[in-house]
Amino acid sequence: MMNRRLQAFFFRTAVVLALGSVYPVQVVSAQETAVDEPPYEQQLMRLSEIFGALHFLRPLCKESDTPSWRDRMEDFLDAETLDENRRRRFIERFNQGYRGFSVAYRECTEAARLAMAQYLSEGEVIISDVTSRYGR
């Protein structure tokens, strides 16, 4: 059974996914060279990295999550990104989070469990901050 903290994190993740419909990405014309980033862009980039880290750490420590963190990332991308370049940046951050831990850990250790707990906590803070500041 899922603990309350993890359930709260999943709920907040769903709220962030819904932000994609509240704050759609602006369509750029041919003359524009860059897409205006939403004010919470860096927080979402960090969240992507956290998703990648958790996608590696949770199964390593025999934690089964349904849907997987990769599936959550795909849902997030579908909800948040219309621009292909922006989508690629989120994917790269996810992959950085995954690779960073895959090089360091081959088995679940106390340090891996601590990192996992800290990432869950940081993800909760990011989601709470983004939804409270921009979800209105």
Which residue ranges define each predicted feature?
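N-terminal secretory signal peptides that target proteins for export/translocation
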Residues: 1-8
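Alpha-helical transmembrane segments
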Residues: 9-14, 44-47
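Bacterial N-terminal signal peptides
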Residues: 12-24
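Sec/Tat signal peptide C-region and signal peptidase I cleavage site
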Residues: 24-30
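N-terminal secretory signal peptides
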Residues: 30-75, 129-136
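Compact alpha-helical subdomains of small soluble proteins
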Residues: 65-136
